[in-house]
Amino acid sequence: MKKYKYQLIALFGSALMFTGCGNQNGESSSNSALASNNAEKVYVAPGEQDEFYAFMSGGYSGNLTVYGLPSGRMFKEIPVFSQFATSGYGYSEETKPMLNTSFGFVPWDDSHHPDISQSKGELDGRWIFINGNNTPRIARISLTTFETEEIIEIPNSAGNHSSSFITENTEYVVAGTRFSVPVPQRDMPINEYKANFKGALSFISVDPEHGHMDIKFQLMMPGFNYDLSHPGRDKSHGWFFFTTYNTEEANSLLEVNASQNDKDFIAAVNWKVIEEYVNNGGGELMPANYAHNVYDESTHTATSTMKKEVLTVDPLKVPGAVYFLPTPKSPHGCDVDPTGQYIIGNGKLSADLTVHSFDRMIEAIEGKKFDGEAYGIPILKFEDVLAGTVKSGGLGPLHTEFDGKGNAYTTFFISSEVVKWKLGTWEVIDRKPTFYSVGHLMIPGGNSRKPFGKYVVAMNKITKDRYLPTGPELEHSAQLYDITGDKMELIYDFPTHGEPHYAAGIPAELLAPKSKKIYRLDENKHPYAVTSPDGAKVVREGNEVHIYMSMIRSHFTPDNIEGVKVGDKVYFHITNHEQDFDVPHGFAMIGQNTSELLIMPGQTKSSVWEPKKPGVWPFYCTDFCSALHQEMQGYVRVSPADSNIELSWSLGD
């Protein structure tokens, strides 16, 4: 115990040393000519556009942010798991169901790992998936509208962390549990964790045409912690690889008790074999309760359905389904190179990188070269699956991606650096400092069969002195490196929103041409849509008042409404009649306890207002739309609850 504590002190002392001397790494000595050259590399002239999109998780923002590369400009924050007052997501009646769960309405999550859909192992740019870590969920976002279209909750899971990574044809998106839990959940002593908790690895099928998700099966694994994962690709397609830690199954003081074993495992899962087993009737249906939320673009409305069962699979009932690859303790990243041959385990407490060989793994399986078993799952002999070791000289390896030219790039958290090394020879080619304490990195397409090896983005956990101070809380630092030459070159710093845990990049030419510009008004199937100003009306249904309203530069129809009473529940159903690109309108009502609405051309959204006292109360457009934007306003007259004022509405009277 004491020895381990001393090791920790030494490691963190090293971290402070590396961080403290970061500015002495030669960056400040760059001459003006070099600085000018770097500026040219990242400069995007007015009217021109970036070469790549970069999608970064927001971490505790619960959302996904969109940047351009090389400029580092932030274009959009896509609301996913968190309410977002800027657009009304999670506040409007249409989007509230997106945040429904078995725990009720949950308006926040911890978003972690975006992954872009693929075909034949290459990015196709249809959707991007991201996981909610806290309340286990997977979201699918359209890369045509840049809006969240679907969220599915994951039962039997907790700390949905080894997610949301996809197979190379987007057959499945996986959701692995970080925290093993009792399955089914029940009251039991925490200290009886060992051998009683389970780790669920969920394989969620994705409809190839519409993208709709459904839990195909859950693989019930031993009660380890499942950290990160990546699919096999090319020759290893059909397999999925998950890093594990806490194979000790400790339930307290994990920084010590979950680091007793010299090695943990990478779990190699043959999902093709399990899929065949399930398709032939295998598996056991288990009662469950989880939400499946889907947004319909034609009605502009989300629905939430509670599902009541899930198919579970015992790996011991499927021969050849799972094998354990010993990997130095507490591996974080589990990264597969573009050929599918090499599986890299980044042991956080190791200075070296362990590279497993897929071919050697198959040979070891066929030759039954086992070194015992864990809960009936064979453990392959370490030396029989090892391809090589990268003697990096760094501290705290976390995550590796690839440039498509035979090179790999790994982040080292403690020594604050990115290390470039050669696949096959394992030699270190280059290393560059980061500022500071880098977590993950991203090369566009760097976790696919076709990387676009021009840039690497390092996502740092510590910012310190990189930007002007903004009080105790700082945005996280990201750094852009040019990797087109033999040596990496740091060319730009830019701040990122929330805490990016992971990112995915794609060439702009694959997305920009198909980006949606408007919603066609004649295709609007919202039940409360007003497709013509003549359809505007106000209807009372008991104590509910429904206002069917249209908006166009620069007025609402109607803009004067009377007959509303204290205690009514007033629904504004508002359709934007614009059909020009980039002409949204906003709506806000004084005293409403939700948020404003931001309504795109051709779209309908609804907001609820519950007036508490009599008066004449204004509403207005929140989004500047024309020279007469200020004139885009109206009034609602609210009368006492016992009044008999008739409903009336008008425009221009």
Segments predicted by a language model, with ranges:
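Extracellular/periplasmic metallocenter environments
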Residues: 600-653
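Surface loop/turn motifs at the tips and blade-to-blade linkers of beta-strand repeat domains
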Residues: 78-81, 110, 152-156, 216-224, ...
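C-terminal motif of bacterial Sec signal peptides marking the signal peptidase cleavage site
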Residues: 17-20
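Repeated scaffold domains used in trafficking and secretory/extracellular systems
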Residues: 40-43, 85-92, 107-120, 156-166, ...
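Conserved beta-propeller blade signature
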Residues: 53-56, 127-130, 172-174, 239-242, ...
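N-terminal edge beta-strand
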Residues: 539-569
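Short, conserved, GDST-rich strand-edge loop motifs in beta-rich repeat architectures
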Residues: 40-52, 113-116, 125, 175-197, ...
